[in-house]
Amino acid sequence: MVAKVWSRVILIFIATVMVFASSQQGDANKVNTASPPGANGIAYASVVAGGSNHVSAAGSVTGDGVQLPNAEVDIDWLEEHLEDSHDYEKGYDLVEQHFNKLLVGNNADASFKVRELASRLILGTLRNNPPVKRLIWDQHPLFVSQVFDLYIGNALKQGSGNPLKYPLLKRYLSILLELIPFNRDFRFEEDYKDILDKLYTESDVPSDIKIKVLELITLDYSNIKGASGWIDRITNVLTDSEMGLDELHKRTFFNAMHALKSEDPKLKLPTNFLNWLAQETKERAHNLKLAQAQADDNDLKVRDLEQEEFDQRLVDSRHSVFGNPMAARMKDPYIVDEL
């Protein structure tokens, strides 16, 4: 695994050199303070001398003797383009023409303010914009690795006293949630899961961060197959009313448990999940009866067929997947059954 990590770091370094090689030289009147390359060979952005509103990947020399040109990122520039990031065409242009600036803005030596703005801008371009996702995967295939290994890793090293730490981490998780589902060939490396595990287990991590971590880990069910720790976390969040899960997250996490149990009928799930499932079955079966009654009465109320389909799936699975398949008709009077 260590060899894989280092090989990926080397690839990230090569990609970074190629990105910066296309950037323009910074204003000659500004004095840039270069940071030496880190242990992984990547030259990080540094704060420009004389003002914290700029960061720059200043002419650092890598171990291979490659000179990285300046690529300045100005807070004013980031703020000016935030609105453009949400526009379908302008967002694409930002990524196509200025992605190198956004990479610099997220590096370790950039201030939290710059990283917050740069990451917000990237996320804005990604939402509801498949061409941008395709562009990033095509032209910056190691970006997701950078987010895991560098951006999240660096943010985790900061103390909890910084009020931007968790908003920044949440932004990075959201970026991953936009990009990873777009690439069917993506596979989670073990160190990615280790990073997510470290983030999830931080003592003061907010609940919304935990939910996003679980969203990521359930993008590929093989991540949690045979991993009792992740299964316990998912079922704990799913069954904890204080987490305030919305319906979409309930579906996501239930579907993960459904898939695991369907594949491995011998899998033992926590009692709290089975108790939650029993209560959910009762409530959702009742809702299904009401929906059917309204349909029979020609009620003009618009039906949520997607919701009804999921409710029926959950109700049916209580015994067919998570219990005794023969018990459905005998033990559950709430089952909606069309004979």
UniProtKB/Swiss-Prot annotation:
An example Gene Ontology CC term for this record: endoplasmic reticulum lumen
The encoding gene = SIL1
One MF term from GO for this chain?
adenyl-nucleotide exchange factor activity
Protein name according to UniProt = Nucleotide exchange factor SIL1
- One of this protein's GO BP terms? protein transport
Q: Where in the cell is it found?
A: Endoplasmic reticulum lumen
Q: What is its main location?
A: endoplasmic reticulum
What's the stated role of this polypeptide? Answer: Required for protein translocation and folding in the endoplasmic reticulum (ER). Functions as a nucleotide exchange factor for the ER lumenal chaperone KAR2.
For this protein, the record's InterPro entries field holds: ARM-like (IPR011989), Sil1_fungi (IPR031884)
Q: Where is the signal peptide?
A: 1-21
Assembly description: Interacts with KAR2.
Residue numbers covered by motif Prevents secretion from ER: 336-339
Alphabetically sorted, this entry's keywords are: Endoplasmic reticulum, Protein transport, Signal, Translocation, Transport
The UniProt similarity line reads: Belongs to the SIL1 family.
